[in-house]
Amino acid sequence: HLTISEPMGVDAVRQFCGDPAIEREYGVKTIVLRKYHLGSKQAEALLEEAADPSAAYGLLTFYRTEAMQPVKGIEVALTGPSGATMVRGRFYIRAWVPPASQVSENDLRALLIYVGGTGPSPEDAASLPPPLPSSGLIAHSEKYLLGLEAARRILPNFRTDLMGFSQSAEAQVGSYLVGENRATVLALHYPTPQMARVRYGAMESMLGINQDKGRDSIYGRRTGSVAILILD
C-alpha cells in the first residue's frame, strides 16, 4: 500500500538518474516520489507527468537500454538491473527497490500492477507512435524523440538542427543488424507532405544524401510526410 506521496521539482530527477533538460523537453513540469509497503518490504516509484501519452512513451524509450526486458503480462513496461519502467497515460513511471529491501521480481511486478494495471487504456495505446519495422531491429534500441536535447544525445554526429523539431517534427531512431554490421535508421515524421519535402530537400543538399562518402554515407528517401535516413 502507498505510505508516502511527495511532489518534487523536475530538477530532483537527477537523484534518480534522470536529466531535467530531457524531462522538460517531453513536457514534464513536476514529479512525484511515492513509497510503498509490500507486506514487510519497501519499494518506491517516481511518477513523471509528460505532455501527453506519446511524450511519456518517448521518455521510456530515451531511458531504456538494450539490457532491459519486457515485463511478462504487463504492457509497455520494462525491467532491468536498476528496476522497472512503465508508461500509463501521460505518466512515465520508474519503480525500484531500495538495496536493503529484499523484494522479489514478482513483488516488483505486483507493484507495477498496483500502480498502473496491466496495460494502458485503448485510447492511450492508440495514441502511441507506431513501432519501427521489427525485422533486424535490435531489441529496445528504438528511441522516440520530440526535440533537440534528446536528439543530440542519441545522434551526436548528426545535424540535428536540420530535423525540424521547431515545425513539430517527430523522430524515431532504431539500430538494426544487417549481416554482421549495425546500422542506425532515422524516421522523421512531419505534419504535412509539403513540410517533409522541404525538410528532406534541405537535408539532401546539406548532408549529401545518397552520395557515396564511404563510412560517412547517408542514404534516404521520402514517402508522403515521412523521411527515412540510414545513417551508418
Regions found by a protein language model. Name each.
Residues 1-232:
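Soluble, non-membrane globular domain cores that form compact, hydrophobic packing
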